[in-house]
């Protein structure tokens, strides 16, 4: 901000000086009297020609200066919104404050459209109008915040163009000034609150997503830990949280763990999907026609060719000779490691690409904004907030059989976000097996990104996932599910290495025998569960992840049960129930 100001000041000063110089040179080099007795060269140097040369030089210099000033100002016009220095300096300018107070942005309503369920609204308290977020920390990773000093995040930033267009009907009762357009989103405020409260009760960092099929409308997207959007106005609190996001990102409430992004924009980190990724491997195998294999699983584990390293089952279980259905139901690592090798690197890469995975270090990162269905959001603004990091596998020619086998069970080089796993559950839960873009907006067309697997293959995968909750690894957790409800799913237990922190949230650093410092790393076991409900005619797909929550059946699956029951209570299964009755009749 200082450089453009200085250049503008210099331009103004030099412009004034230029005018004075023009007058001075014109007077100094005015035509001499006709009777001056001097050689022609002297008369020429003292006349109009010299004046023209002076003016030409000054014009060129002034033009260069103007181009420089224009360039700097143009830079700030296009880069202002993404520059923290510019955003924070707005607070010092009274003109910006008056401009902001002259009009209001639109309200953001949940899918019901009811005022009492608004996600973002205004409040008129004795003539003082303030923007508030009724769900608070339960939805701040969605709603975001809006502040003079620290900018905006979430919906406030992603839909800012829509929210500032002057058509709000709700704000007219609050203010006579210019008002923005209202926005109704796909979120169900009641389900959103329920999801967040379930994560908080888990007592560990966690995330959950619920999608409404077939259009993948986001019903709930919760992340914990969280923060109250009102804290954004407290500069010391916000700076402390921002600093933590830089130094201890694993602990930061600013991270939207459902997406793997920061609420203010930008990527954060990935997760390993664990055994939930066997859903992908099973789907690829079924669709590729190699699902009838019987593999032997031994006490010593399965050693991929040329690796010398074995892959064993959780807790040392030995399943013996086993087929796909039982292997999926009991989450047999050895079976799926062998199945992944049977499907083969190239075919796995093909199916992974259908889900927009990067499968090689040489792959160019795809534009993750393509994974969303947008109508009212500005793509660039939306992408900076809600576009999850590129999902990754390593299925390049350099990948060893061990690498391929390990990735087939959701470990190794598999890098995913929670929403990616929800989308996989959606793809196999949909009747046509399509990979569909999620959306926060209502009334849009279903955006099919790719045909992941055939409808017949999807039906077979759903059958496998139904077994998991009936008599497999999730049967204990789903024993408490309302008997009128059915579901399908897959548990996951994922090993991951993270930074170790002290009680104050600082990374623990140690010094090795050579005097070099290292950040201490520890292993954690994340708990996962993905799936759909009802089982016969899915209406929702979901994914739940609890960091360091242990086995998927112990932490994530019970949360999924509660989400299914809440979704049913809110009426999202009524169409599916009627369809089931029609088929039986």
Protein language model features and the residues they cover:
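Beta-lactam-recognizing serine transpeptidase/beta-lactamase-like catalytic domain environment
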Residues: 214, 218-275, 280-548, 552, ...
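Periplasmic/cell-envelope proteins involved in peptidoglycan metabolism and beta-lactam response
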Residues: 1-248, 253, 257-275, 290-293, ...
